[in-house]
């Protein structure tokens, strides 16, 4: 779904897709969020919903298989004002069922563009200040025109990413790439560039989605290393448009 295995001769990519040596990309843990019924119980306008931010804190490496227990709760609901939308934060904890080992915690921020003006508190501003100067690493990954149709098989069947008419009704010229696909591509870029291709070195992975990616575009991840921390941002090469910031 994020392009791993495009080169069948690249053994570093094969380990993510070949069952005899398979490991999981940490960002795959975000799949556990798709099954939360919390937002389905609200009256928000789902046509106008997009992914706003994503945070991942890794406690233990994600197994490639197993039974898991997830617990989700709403931890924040913020009002951007009439006509400006609302922000909803949901925290999901993921544990192994067999021994209750914690795997990770996820915080997903939903931007409900059509549901502002309900009188809630304003969203707190959280801006990261990255190191100055040119990035220490730059990594490019080309997406395919059918990338969203492949990625949706991970469990996110929102028609915004597959149905041209639905996408237009939501204000986009055509179906957009899942934010979680862009997130996974950024995760892959950092692991390949900074983590010596070792998934166990990634302990936290956060971002803010600032603009959509269209399938077929090239995602450029720029990274600044500061000790054990890596600051990053992503942009689309063809449009020179920032699509992820606060990474």
Predicted features, each with a name:
Residues 1, 21, 29-30, 73, ...:
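Residue-level recognition of well-ordered secondary-structure positions
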Residues 1-23, 98, 110-177, 191:
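Catalytic strand-loop segment that frames the active site of acyl-thioester-processing enzymes
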Residues 1-67, 194:
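Hydrophobic, proline/glycine-rich low-complexity stretches
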Residues 49-139, 209, 213-216, 220-247:
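HotDog/MaoC-like acyl-thioester-processing domains
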Residues 144-220, 224-231, 240:
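Acidic/His-leaning functional-site neighborhoods
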Residues 25-31, 49-52, 56, 111-112, ...:
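Long, contiguous hydrophobic alpha-helical segments, chiefly transmembrane helices and signal peptides
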Residues 12-14, 32-40, 53, 70-74, ...:
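Short amphipathic alpha-helical surface micro-motifs
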């Amino acid at each position: 779904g994020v392009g791993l295995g495009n080169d069948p001769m690249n053994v570093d990519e094969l380990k993510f897709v070949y069952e005899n040596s398979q490991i999981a990309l940490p960002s795959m843990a975000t799949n556990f969020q798709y099954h939360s019924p919390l937002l389905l119980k609200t009256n928000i306008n789902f046509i106008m919903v997009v992914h706003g931010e994503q945070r991942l804190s890794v406690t233990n490496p994600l197994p490639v298989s197993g039974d898991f227990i997830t617990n989700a709760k709403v931890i924040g609901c913020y009002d951007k004002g009439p006509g400006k939308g609302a922000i909803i934060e949901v925290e999901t904890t993921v544990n192994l069922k067999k021994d209750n080992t914690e795997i990770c915690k996820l915080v997903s921020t939903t931007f409900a563009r059509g549901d502002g003006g309900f009188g809630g508190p304003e969203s707190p501003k959280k801006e990261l200040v990255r190191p100055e100067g040119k990035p220490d690493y730059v990594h490019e990954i080309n997406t395919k025109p059918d990338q969203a149709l492949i990625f949706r098989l991970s469990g996110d069947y929102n028609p915004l990413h597959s149905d041209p008419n639905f996408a237009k009704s939501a204000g986009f010229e055509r179906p957009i790439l899942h934010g979680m696909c862009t997130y996974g591509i950024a995760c892959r870029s950092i692991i390949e560039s900074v983590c010596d291709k070792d998934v166990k070195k990634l302990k936290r992975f956060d971002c803010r989605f600032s603009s959509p990616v269209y399938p077929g575009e090239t995602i450029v991840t720029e990274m600044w290393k500061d000790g054990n921390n890596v600051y990053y941002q992503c942009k689309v090469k063809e449009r020179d448009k920032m699509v992820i910031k606060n990474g």
